[in-house]
Amino acid sequence: MALPDFSMRQLLEAGVHFGHQTHRWNPKMKPYIFGDRNNIHIIDLAQTVPMLSRALQVVSDTVARGGRVLFVGTKRQASEIIADSAKRSAQYYVNSRWLGGMMTNWKTISNSIQRLRKLDEILNGEAQGFTKKERLNLEREREKLDKALGGIRDMGGTPDLMFIIDTNKEKIAIDEAKRLGIPVVAIIDSNCDPDLIDYPIPGNDDASRAIALYCELISRAAIDGIARQQGSSGRDLGASSEVPVEPALEEAAEG
């Protein structure tokens, strides 16, 4: 295994270089702006390439030493991609809504996860002794908990690294990571504050193809870390070396 390859052309074809309207920018992003076109800021991909490569190395290194990566993206166009990419790389995710205290009040979150497990046991069994209405209420409670916590139910503690799409929307998650000293890898669009992020990646954080490309690369970097960890322990890598490729990557490579 090796870190995933990517090219400037793939970034261009995924629309990574398109920022927001110029009047919406954060002036702190000035060093990462190439220019503007039709009142849209153009992000300097010559800087994105090395910064993305650095972030991929950090993800791989974190997983290689047994660390956990938490994917965070709750906006509509990121939600499904975030979950799929985290699952494929045996990592964790929050893709519905960030609950305040999700990291800083882990004990309370752990209790909710225990409740989710208990509900699974009850409902996966015969659920004897419950009326139809009681069972329906339990199912609704489980569904609500699973939506909020399903992606972290097996995490076992706070993560060692967080990967975030849309730093403005996920500001609470970033604040909690900072308080706990958890490093953050994040996409920073032209309207973001790069100072908040340990490993920033300048790029569009709205286009589905761009989000799919980032998530695919981060996922494959995590899988590379798993392979390195297993290799160092002498275990057979088995099927983990076979990784499905996101359509965005395939299309970009073929284009």
Curated annotation (Swiss-Prot):
Gene: rpsB
SUPFAM superfamilies: Ribosomal protein S2
Biological processes, Gene Ontology terms: translation
Disulphide connectivity of cysteines: none
Domain of life, source organism: Bacteria
PROSITE patterns named in the record: RIBOSOMAL_S2_1 (PS00962), RIBOSOMAL_S2_2 (PS00963)
GO molecular function: structural constituent of ribosome
UniProt name for this protein: Small ribosomal subunit protein uS2
